[in-house]
């Protein structure tokens, strides 16, 4: 159950980050007032996802040691890098991909210890 909550916290946080990116992409080049920006559905999705992710994270911290749970959040780096590359078509260089592999290796190593 704890690992499912940890995964949910990661996914909600990533959803919030992606929604933030979509919100600012929609604002780019448009001369929008702050009241118009506040009505962006992407912004509200970001706030909801990040707020929900925070609440789920608090549940995770009640069930898992922070020394186990927090390093697992580095999976967000991996997920967001994949989304940046394949959804937003952002360039990702070889050094960045190597970092992603190191993060995956670190998470796997820490996951075996827990």
From Swiss-Prot:
It comes from the Bacteria. The chain crosses the membrane at residues 41-61, 64-84, 91-111. Residues 39-112 form the EamA domain. This is Probable 4-amino-4-deoxy-L-arabinose-phosphoundecaprenol flippase subunit ArnE. It comes from Pseudomonas fluorescens (strain Pf0-1). It is a multi-pass membrane protein. Heterodimer of ArnE and ArnF. GO terms for biological process: lipid A biosynthetic process; lipopolysaccharide biosynthetic process. Translocates 4-amino-4-deoxy-L-arabinose-phosphoundecaprenol (alpha-L-Ara4N-phosphoundecaprenol) from the cytoplasmic to the periplasmic side of the inner membrane. Pathway: Bacterial outer membrane biogenesis; lipopolysaccharide biosynthesis. GO terms for molecular function: carbohydrate derivative transmembrane transporter activity. The gene is arnE. Gene3D superfamilies: 1.10.3730.20. GO terms for cellular component: plasma membrane. Belongs to the ArnE family. It is found in: Cell inner membrane. Keywords: Cell inner membrane, Cell membrane, Lipid A biosynthesis, Lipid biosynthesis, Lipid metabolism, Lipopolysaccharide biosynthesis, Membrane, Transmembrane, Transmembrane helix, Transport. Its main location: membrane.
């Amino acid at each position: 159950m704890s690992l499912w909550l940890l995964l949910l916290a990661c996914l909600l946080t990533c959803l919030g980050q992606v929604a933030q990116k979509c919100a600012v992409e929609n604002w780019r080049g448009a001369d929008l007032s702050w009241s118009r920006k506040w009505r962006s559905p992407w912004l509200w999705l970001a706030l909801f996802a990040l707020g929900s992710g925070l609440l789920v994270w608090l549940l995770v911290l009640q069930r898992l040691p922070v020394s186990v749970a927090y390093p697992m959040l580095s999976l967000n780096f991996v997920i967001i890098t994949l989304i940046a590359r394949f959804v937003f078509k952002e360039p990702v260089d070889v050094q960045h991909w190597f970092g992603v592999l190191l993060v995956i290796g670190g998470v796997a190593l820490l996951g075996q210890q827990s």
